[in-house]
């Protein structure tokens, strides 16, 4: 009887230890940080990240500052590190402003990734990238060229800020493409809405009023593009080409009314999912060097590319770029197929 009891205790102890180990393993936590909360684009990315977390048994926390600031993001990063999160995935408002905090986090063993907007590559392991600057800059100009068929035209650029990494890289490439392929296009102004819906609308209306002969507004920003469309409707400017990047749910009414003929983006829900799957691969010590691939359920295979794809000169082991499989141009024929 005593021997039976000892065996039972041993079995229960082993079961308890196994359960505890499983609990510890399942308790991995990932923080997914946007530039700011309250914007549909970032919310959709967060939804994708949390869906992936549920599928993987990982606790994914979505949180960000109420305004797009380095200090707000640094505070969140530090908080998550102090709470012993295993990985942090951040859409950086600055290429270098977050670097000291991110490097400290990496020194403490936290896996650091970026999504949507990158830091300097030495400040993270992988960037989950919607497209190279050349791809997205070209996409912007091509969408505008579909509507502006004049040799000489006036174009305005309008997006979030002069310091944000991703949009400035795209705009730099777009301006270079205009210079090479549309030398008659004059870029009359470049202005910013600073991720604020009210300010973005005011700025867009100001651009349209200041340039009554404007032919196109290129707005590669989730707040700026709908603001430009709303401004055109408010001021009854029906002959203005408005293109850029935003989510289909936000832009649907403008497309249905014909104010916006086409605009672009990528599947940001997929971007959130891919980010968490890559972070999970790092936490599981799976090989993730340049050339290595990862199969993601419902999405397919993604491959690690060198940082040079983004125009960087920094390469290191365990460091690189994971490109989304595709980008999308939305118009009245396909917009109702998407819900994000």
Curated annotation (Swiss-Prot):
Family: Belongs to the bacterial solute-binding protein 2 family.
Subunit structure, interactors included: The complex is composed of two ATP-binding proteins (LsrA), two transmembrane proteins (LsrC and LsrD) and a solute-binding protein (LsrB).
Protein name, UniProt field: Autoinducer 2-binding protein LsrB
PANTHER family: ABC TRANSPORTER PERIPLASMIC-BINDING PROTEIN YPHF, D-XYLOSE-BINDING PERIPLASMIC PROTEIN
Any one Gene Ontology molecular-function term assigned to this protein's record: carbohydrate binding
CDD domains: PBP1_LsrB_Quorum_Sensing
InterPro entries with a match to the protein in the record: Bact_Solute-Bind_Prot2 (IPR050555), LsrB (IPR030159), Peripla_BP_I (IPR028082), SBP_2_dom (IPR025997)
SUPFAM superfamilies listed in its UniProt record: Periplasmic binding protein-like I
Gene responsible for this protein: lsrB
Origin species: Salmonella paratyphi A (strain ATCC 9150 / SARB42)
Subcellular location(s) of the protein: Periplasm
Task of the protein: Part of the ABC transporter complex LsrABCD involved in autoinducer 2 (AI-2) import. Binds AI-2 and delivers it to the LsrC and LsrD permeases.
Cellular component per GO, a single term: ATP-binding cassette (ABC) transporter complex
Keyword annotations of the record: Periplasm, Signal
Extent of the signal sequence: 1-26
Coiled coil: none
